A protein has these predicted regions:
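Predominantly soluble domains enriched in secretory-pathway, periplasmic, or organellar proteins
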Residues: 1-293
Length: 293
């Protein structure tokens, strides 16, 4: 039985009662009973002119609320499913073509990456009456970006030690942003175009993978010095990484080798692995206890 259709991503409410998915076509979100998978609400992403927009960047918030972005419409919306029969939606300006988004680990901010313009859209979830605001608005101005082989995933951004580490679109850089001011404080040169910049759970390191043709490489950044300390070749087609909850191991999907490889984060050596047919995302159950997924 097909319920969600061409869902491009999903999230679960805090109480575990609802599964909500986002759709490209037709644009919108759908809520399902987590036990029966019965459709309980269908919320179209309808724009002012009556067309429907692709939905991206879906994340759970406190209660039965979900936040998401509308690509064509340039909006951010929050839908409250406290009464699934009568969902209530708030709308905010989102900038031009938001393509992905994340909620910061403390649950306070929702940040959407913008494909159609420089900068990012930020909403303070503790102060919704202030609406959205633009951050890093000058990023990329006056520079010639490289061709984009793969869009970075914002869920692969990291927040560690009061700094956010963001993959730069079309550049061989990781941006460092102060999370108090949301201003850029540094740029770290890396081997190629970053896709994921993921923090070890203790925040001491950022592990970075890259777009094709350099997707067999991984680099490690020291968050104290802001320098690349290790350059690794774990396998062919490294698409995703996930740390164990205490950070002593990282699992990497090597799609083109049909393997998942396991590295010791202290020694940077492979300590295990197993066969898997074209592995992509790796997700551990520890995510179930984190807001924004």
């Amino acid at each position: 039985m097909v319920q969600a259709g061409n869902a491009i991503g999903g999230s679960i409410s805090h109480d575990g009662s609802l599964v909500v998915v986002q759709n490209y076509e037709p644009g919108g979100i759908k809520a399902f009973d987590a036990n029966t998978l019965e459709l309980v609400a269908d919320v179209p992403a309808t724009t002012e002119d009556g067309t429907r927009s692709k939905v991206v960047g879906l994340a759970d918030l406190s209660g039965k609320r979900f936040i998401y972005s509308l690509f064509e419409a340039g909006e951010i919306r929050i839908t409250d499913f406290s009464d699934p029969a009568k969902p209530v939606t708030q709308r905010f300006a989102g900038g031009k073509q938001p393509y992905d988004a994340l909620v910061t680990p403390d649950g306070r901010y929702y940040i959407a990456g913008l494909f159609g313009e420089d900068g990012l859209a930020l909403i303070d979830l503790w102060n919704l009456d202030k609406g959205s605001r633009k951050i890093l608005s000058g990023y990329g101005r006056g520079e010639q970006p490289l061709p984009v082989f793969k869009m970075p995933h914002l869920r692969g951004w990291s927040v560690a030690g009061g700094r956010a580490y963001l993959p730069a679109i079309g550049r061989h850089e990781v941006l460092v942003v102060d999370t108090d001011t949301w201003e850029e404080v540094d740029r770290i040169k890396v081997k190629s175009q970053p896709v994921f910049a993921m923090a070890r759970p203790d925040g001491r390191e950022i592990w970075v993978n890259f777009a094709f043709p350099d997707n067999g490489w991984v680099q490690v950044i020291d968050t104290v010095t802001g320098k690349v300390t290790d350059t690794l070749q774990p396998g062919r087609g490294i698409l995703h990484m996930e740390f164990l909850s205490k950070g002593h191991e990282v699992w990497l999907s090597a799609r083109d080798d049909n393997k998942v490889v396991i590295f010791d984060t202290a020694t940077k050596k492979q300590i295990g692995g197993f066969d898997s047919a074209s592995p992509s995302g790796i997700f551990f159950t520890t995510r179930a206890a984190r807001t924004g997924f």
